[in-house]
């Protein structure tokens, strides 16, 4: 009788090894099912924060123009230095396209720059006050996943057409009233490159990428537009993400006639195209 009670206690008083293995297996299966959904939810949350960052930057961009006789802010950070000779480049010299134009962010990427240097470059830019002095608006929450991104304090760039440079002969705009169809014209974009120098470039005269298309958020990118709204674009060509990853920092022009992603990005960046 005592032996039977002991057996019952061993059987029902705790889990057997087999029962524990079954429970662990069930938990593993549930985790395998739930983790992709949790990751997607986490990414959607970060995407929403990024979209809001771009929207706030876009509104700051509009407010700046309102306060400056409709002149849009200088979007070129590559040669800005400390905004003045001798460290600034030719674009900032008399006769240059950005003479006496403070950029939205001072040059914030160069060899030897410290974290404080990069933060001060943002604070010294023309939009910092219009952004409510909020440093978080300048960086996508997903930054840090890619190599080198954790060293960046800014992950957004201005497209070349919006007072950066007339790349590939494209029309560069300086007045907000000169923008035709503001809801379709991009201003800020996530920068997929290894560094955020200058603006974001794409070819004007041919259907080709110049800077890599951003692919931080799944297989798509967040953009802001000249009317102040922001939106997410999902790339249609399955090769877009692969091209971006394979060509990071190489600025390699590969003409792709008929590529809908390139054409759409070119239209947003430049407006009316020559082709």
Task: Report each predicted region and the residues it spans.
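N-terminal leader/signal peptides at the extreme start of proteins
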Residues: 1-15
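Intracellular coupling helices
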Residues: 4, 42-49
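N-terminal single-pass transmembrane signal-anchor helix
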Residues: 11-42
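Short, well-structured segments within or immediately adjacent to enzyme catalytic domains
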Residues: 48-275
